[in-house]
Amino acid sequence: MSALISLKALSVTFDDKKVLDSISLDLHKGKITTLIGPNGAGKSTLVKIIIGLLKPTSGQVQRQAKLTIGYVPQKLKLNDTLPLNVIRFLNLSGKYSQQETMEALRLVGAEHLYKSNMHKLSGGETQRVLLARALLQRPDLLVLDEPAQGVDIQGQIDLYDLIESIRHRFDCAVFMVSHDLHLVMAKTDEVICLQHHVCCSGAPEDITQHPSYIALFGSAARDSLAIYHHQHDHHHHDLAGQPVSGDATQCNHHHHGHHHD
């Protein structure tokens, strides 16, 4: 299976300081990849390269033709003096019908927020609205930079469930960045540990035993790391939190939005 994005021996240097050193990775349709690492490890730089905002100093970035990317930023900066409700905010990123924007909000369980002031949303509510904005692109690749930041533990669990549902509904690749090691989705297909270079990569349960992971984060982090396992003894929920039955992978994937060539 060909990768949506393939990075080969990619390096980035700022002012003679190597921020990323010989990074190679592939992102595949329907797979969740989580990037972990301490602050200053180069995670945000790698995200900028993946979404096309930055070019590497050396190495190759190969993207599938007409690749569509949905991006959820780490922080949302809005002008506090400008009144902005959720619907108006969503329409800033493109011309969408009210039906399309309401459907995106419904998918993430935020339909009730459509008239809410963006400045007054909680951390979890803001993340859901940002996810809705990304989904309006009908992405092949969903990139989430620290999606659980500012969200409480239960909110994080709900958010990770939502991301898992999105992966199945749209059959998209998900690339998620985090420095919080205390809650990592067991649904992640691959964890990549970054400290300017790739220290180690693999399944979440394997990474915590890897010598490079322990050297970087310490044995205490290994012992305290909680891998959230999705419970299979209850009804699955749709993206708005309603119980459903059947296979989520059978949902339709509509094509619409902005493309990266």
UniProtKB/Swiss-Prot annotation:
Residues 236-261 are annotated as: Disordered. GO terms for cellular component: plasma membrane. It holds the Pfam family ABC_tran. It catalyses: Zn(2+)(out) + ATP(in) + H2O(in) = Zn(2+)(in) + ADP(in) + phosphate(in) + H(+)(in). The keyword Nucleotide-binding applies. It comes from the Bacteria. Residues 5-220 form the ABC transporter domain. ATP binds at G37, P38, N39, G40, A41, G42, K43, S44. GO terms for biological process: response to zinc ion. Keywords: ATP-binding, Cell inner membrane, Cell membrane, Ion transport, Membrane, Nucleotide-binding, Translocase, Transport, Zinc, Zinc transport. It is found in: Cell inner membrane. Residues 252-261 have a biased composition (Basic residues). It is a peripheral membrane protein. GO terms for molecular function: ABC-type zinc transporter activity; ATP binding; ATP hydrolysis activity. InterPro entries: AAA+_ATPase, ABC_transporter-like_ATP-bd, Metal_Ion_Import_ABC, P-loop_NTPase. Its EC number is 7.2.2.20. Part of the ABC transporter complex ZnuABC involved in zinc import. Responsible for energy coupling to the transport system. The complex is composed of two ATP-binding proteins (ZnuC), two transmembrane proteins (ZnuB) and a solute-binding protein (ZnuA). Belongs to the ABC transporter superfamily. Zinc importer (TC 3.A.1.15.5) family. PANTHER family: METAL TRANSPORT SYSTEM ATP-BINDING PROTEIN TM_0124-RELATED, ZINC IMPORT ATP-BINDING PROTEIN ZNUC. This is Zinc import ATP-binding protein ZnuC. It comes from Vibrio vulnificus (strain YJ016).
